[in-house]
Amino acid sequence: MRKITLLVCLLAAVLAFAQFSGPGYYRVHNVGSDRYISIKGTDFNNTTNPDAFWPCILMLNDSAQISDPASIIYIPNMGQASLYAQGVSTYSLTGLMLKIELDTVCVDDKPVYLAKTTYKHFPCIFRDYGLGLTAGTLGGAPEYYWWIEPVNAESIETSFLGLQPVNNEVADADGWYWATICVDFPFTLPEDGGVEGAYTVTDVVMGIDSLYYAEPVKVYGQGDTVPATVPVLLKCAAAYPSGNKIIPVGDIANNTNLPLKSDLLMGNYFSTFYNHCSFAHPEQYGEYIPDDATMAAPGYLVLGVSEDGRLAFCPKEASEDDNTYLAANTAWLDITDLDLSGVTTIYLGQAPVEPEIIRGDASGDGVLNVKDVSCVVNYLLVADSEESQKAEINIEAADFDGDGRVSVRDIALIINELLMEE
């Protein structure tokens, strides 16, 4: 049972931890349903009817909001306001402004807020009692109350954006997990937050195994700020979101040209629709036109796990209704302009190359020493008829003089090289 206490509004605002403290990034948490607002944009209904909020806002359970960028809401003010996320605003999606008010009620010793609008001259109060964001007129019940929880450097222990790796069971050869992201806000990679760095992909190369590889190139490390609208790969220490923390900072960004592109990576905000709206100027409100889906294409490969169980960029699998929408807030590899016709798997990592040959390193241990002399001597002494007893040597390295065969001359040259090193 939640403890509801009537307090003086000003005292609540000063003493409580979770509160609106000026323009910035927040999560909006319903008291009654214990769910969070996220801006999804799966449907649009630009009208003055407050029910227009219902299709463009999805309420998330606590476990889901941790890793969903759509739950990171930029709130500019408490007056006639709009909620900004995913490159759009609730005003541009619905045509409705919100009035956010600090109430005189505290819940769990934290101040709560009311979200209001006006419809046909009647006040409406937004609520969530488990069926999504709807408007009512009565108020007073827990589902009408909202906590506004800051997401910033000071809140990192309790409120952050956590990254969910593309697969929590498959790491790279060094034990790192990988995630992708594309968001409308800059974010920092905090020290000891679990995210080692942000990476891009600049090229795809073939390895000596005749497979293709995309080697991540590090562009930002811990303590750095990743700019908004830049699709990146993120190298993560943990298999779960709470172990891979990033923090939104700075000003929210807008970009009317989606998908967003950086090197060979592309990214999006929404899954189902492109973003065509600029909320920078009031006269452009309402221009959000969902005319194109962010669909998979032959040259788009998403990060996942290959058939042989390795991290790789592969084609997006079709869903049950045969739609191949690319997931929201992700980055994918665009090989459209590369000469890779028919290539459907590109492994994440450095392409294997021919090992460097050290002249005289007959044993193949990477060091030129007396052991190499013994290997060549053994190789030459054992008769060809006793091939199975010959020492295993690197013929190319043992052929020190490069005449195409291993001989006593090579032994002499190896010994001479060792003496010169001393």
What is each of the regions a protein language model found here?
Residues 50, 62-64, 68-69, 352-422:
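Cellulosome-associated attachment modules in secreted, modular CAZymes
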Residues 145, 150-195, 221-354:
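A short, polar beta-strand/turn micro-motif
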Residues 45-67, 177-210:
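Surface-exposed turn/loop modules enriched in turn-prone residues
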Residues 29-34, 41, 86-90, 116-119, ...:
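Short, flexible beta-strand-to-coil junctions
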Residues 19-157, 255-262:
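Lectin-like carbohydrate-binding module/patch detector with strong preference for beta-trefoil
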Residues 41-45, 105, 119-121, 237-241, ...:
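Acidic glycine-/aspartate-rich tracts in secreted/extracellular proteins
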Residues 1-4:
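Positively charged n-region of N-terminal signal peptides that target proteins for export
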Residues 9-18:
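Hydrophobic h-region of N-terminal signal peptides that target proteins for export
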